[in-house]
Amino acid sequence: MKFILKSMSSYVALWLVAVVTAFALAVASPNEARVMGHLPTFMSQTLMREPVTVPGGLPSDRTLALITFQRDQRAQADSWITGLNLNSDASISWMRMPVLSDPGTAGGRDAVENRLMQNYPDAGQRAKLVPVFTDRADFVRAVGLGGVQNSYAVVINRQGDVLARVEGKFDADKARLLRETLQPRGF
């Protein structure tokens, strides 16, 4: 009888350990947002001086962000604008998002914004450009990007979840993936 009770209590203890382990794994396992990345919340403004709260204040629940880190990546972002016909296709909400090292002062940020305005003289371009002043490495890590060597086209929602991401210049297959993700989900 003593052996049976010891065995039964061992089985109960083992069962409890298994249940607790399963629960811990379910809670700790990565969900889609953790796997793809998450855009941190921040306040910014377009080059037209319109304030924007990102991601909560995005114009659509699914927005295409063309993220660049270096001036020479502008052509990669431009290839997406041309390839997806973003300047004419109002069905896609989008923005340019250059990620810039924060100079640390309001005057330094103003100087960078003034240089950007020289590079983007058109009001339509300025309205779509939202500079992000932050630590680039932290941004790359949070959003789940591979580094700063290429630009990225990223679909984000208003909660900041990265729903899709592609790297580099426009490509028809990559564009198909982004278009599918940009489509609203019906139930």
Question: What are the functions of these language-model segments?
Answer:
Residues 29-54, 126-128:
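N-terminal "domain-start" segment that seeds a small globular fold
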Residues 57-77:
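Short active-site neighborhood of thiol/selenol oxidoreductases, capturing the structured segment around
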Residues 71-82, 178-187:
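Short, solvent-exposed cationic patches
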Residues 73-121:
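Structural microenvironment flanking redox-active thiols in thiol-disulfide oxidoreductases
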Residues 95-97, 110-148:
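Short, internal strand/loop/helix patches
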Residues 149-187:
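Thiol-/selenol-based redox modules, centered on thioredoxin-like
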